[in-house]
Amino acid sequence: QARYSYNTRRWAVASHLEHFDTGFQMDTAFLNRVGDTNAWAYGEVNFYPDKAKWPWLRRIQPFTFNQATHDLIQRGDEFFTIEAVRLFFTRQGFVRLDRLTGHEPFAGQRFKTNRWRVQSNAQLFRWLSVYANASAGLATFYDPVSPYQGRSNDVSSGFTFQPSGRLSESVDFQRVAFDRESSGERV
């Protein structure tokens, strides 16, 4: 493994390179992928709007994340890039908008992974936090015998109610819809 990172208040960049042989095993850690060589690069820039003009907006952070992997077990190459922007607000408010494009190997085939995603959360009150996420686009149906390209639409939302240090209740909702891309058939 090799890693490099550099950051200031305005900029951050990082890169990473690693290789795990097919026979690699580590019993004391969770490792879900071996037999690959992986490299990624990340870059961000931070903008701090004028608090007098935009008192509710704390920071704007465009960023990119790019990853390339040669996978010996799945017999192919994976590549994806994420182009995104994060918005940081008062009350621990946060919104992330991104577009993921790329492809991945599975069972000797190549599948597209193009998706739009939105993530958000906020601490509305000391005792109430909320979140909502959505994702839509191409996805893979991971059947080891007969995988295929699909389209997935995912939404999730929820809240945590914590009126005291002794009581915390979270309620979450998640819906995932997956359709076969070739026919539109719901899976």
What are these regions (language model features)?
Residues 1-187:
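Exposed, low-structure sequence patches enriched in small/polar residues
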